């Protein structure tokens, strides 16, 4: 069976990354593509399901996992830990399923060091003006918060060249097509096709 591919997807807040991933999943069978489920020490929010939205663990459990190098990457955010389990990712990839990991550039660097065969995709907004409009469109943040988010977005975007693929989300449908095209091209790579069609190739080349 062909090994699945791990896709690292990064973007500044407001670039449409989460919407694109969710739209992609709706077009892909579950046995082809999944989103990585992270471990976290924060409390579940209403409606969140253990193992579906996150794997909820306590601080001691998380630190024990860190001590045995169980995470591909982990970070502390607002006094809570978040991490991507190496074992969970590898188990899914071994079944031939592609896994999408929604993560920032720092986490992406950690992942690439431990899984150099992962493919990485960066999503850009079409302009700063449009990014500002999208950030303001939420209608919940002060000018100070918006300015901080914009500064964080610029810092995130400065790492775009570290990625394998670049998508500009100007038109959503076009960006989604670009994302699908990347997945299709990766599935047609020689290494994956040789595994997938090993029996056929053997028969075709037999005397």
From Swiss-Prot:
Top-level taxon of the source organism: Bacteria
Single GO cellular component term: cytosol
Keywords attached to this entry: ATP-binding, Cytoplasm, Kinase, Nucleotide-binding, Transferase
Domain Guanylate kinase-like, residue spans: 4-184
Top EC class, one word: transferase
GO molecular function: ATP binding; guanylate kinase activity
Catalysed reactions listed for this entry: GMP + ATP = GDP + ADP
Similarity field: Belongs to the guanylate kinase family.
Protein's job: Essential for recycling GMP and indirectly, cGMP.
HAMAP family found in the cross-reference section: Guanylate_kinase
The protein, known as: Guanylate kinase
Lineage, broadest ranks: Bacteria, Pseudomonadati, Pseudomonadota, Gammaproteobacteria, Enterobacterales
Protein's gene: gmk
């Amino acid at each position: 069976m062909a090994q699945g591919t791990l896709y690292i997807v990064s973007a500044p807040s407001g670039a449409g990354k989460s919407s694109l991933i969710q739209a992609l999943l709706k077009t892909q069978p579950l046995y082809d593509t999944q989103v990585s489920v992270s471990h976290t020490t924060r409390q579940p929010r209403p409606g969140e399901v253990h193992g579906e939205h996150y794997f909820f663990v306590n601080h001691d459990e998380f630190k024990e996992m860190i001590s045995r190098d169980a995470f591909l990457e982990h970070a502390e955010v607002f006094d809570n830990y978040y991490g991507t389990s190496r074992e969970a990712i590898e188990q899914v990839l071994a079944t031939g399923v592609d896994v999408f990991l929604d993560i920032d550039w720092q986490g992406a660097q950690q992942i690439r060091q431990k899984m150099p065969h992962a493919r990485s995709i960066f999503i850009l907004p079409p302009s700063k003006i449009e990014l500002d409009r999208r950030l303001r469109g939420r209608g919940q943040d002060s000018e100070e918060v918006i300015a901080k988010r914009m500064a964080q977005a610029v810092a995130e975007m400065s790492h775009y060249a570290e990625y394998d693929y670049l998508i500009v989300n100007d038109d959503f449908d076009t960006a989604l097509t670009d994302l699908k095209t990347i997945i299709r091209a990766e599935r047609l790579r020689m290494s994956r096709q040789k595994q997938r069609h090993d029996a056929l190739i053997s028969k075709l080349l037999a005397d």
